[in-house]
Amino acid sequence: RPPRSTLFPYTTLFRSLACNTASAKALRSIQMNNLPKIDPERRVLGVIRPTVECIGNITQSRHIGILATAGTIKSESYPLEVHKLYPDIQVNGVTCPMWVPLVENNEAQNEGADYFIRKYINQLLQKDSQIDTVILGCTHYPLLLPKIQQYIPDNIRVIAQGEYVAESLKDYLCRHPEMDIKCTKNNSCLFYTTEAEDKFIESASTFLNQQINVKRITLE
């Protein structure tokens, strides 16, 4: 949902919607409707556009696949963004409804996960045998990457978003030094959550494999 003003007194200049479904459904509305009213100096960035920008230099066949949640696939955000930059690229997507539950319930590396990982990959490749690049269109999915790579043919490149989104933000700051100079650089991280801290810490440890500082907040 759109950001509430209670979130923006915190001192970060940027919000990254590190969720493909949120980026697909809410980013434009947040940027166009909410930020001008809350604080026009702040920025909210998504994860879909930075991922798409790299594709043109990677795919050789000009056929790519998207593995994502139902919300992201239904939004058609990936085909729309791809065709803005690369009209010649063919895009096919498949929903993977079991992948997020596998990650969030810490079942990603269990043998039972193999069935669902193989199932959705096969569905995608049956749609288009010329696919040579697959985007993991959900920020949960990199935790499944070791198993995904077991079932993806060797000639297909798998794109996890993290490094591309990070490089895009770095490039943004280089192009906007007036924003970069306002950013603190003390290498500290504080996580805010709207759910119970212990539940958040348990989930975050799966992703980050480190101790984190968490503060619970309430959206008004």
Regions found by a protein language model. Name each.
Residues 9-220:
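Non-catalytic structural scaffold of enzyme domains
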Residues 1-8:
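Short, exposed "boundary/linker" segments that immediately precede the start
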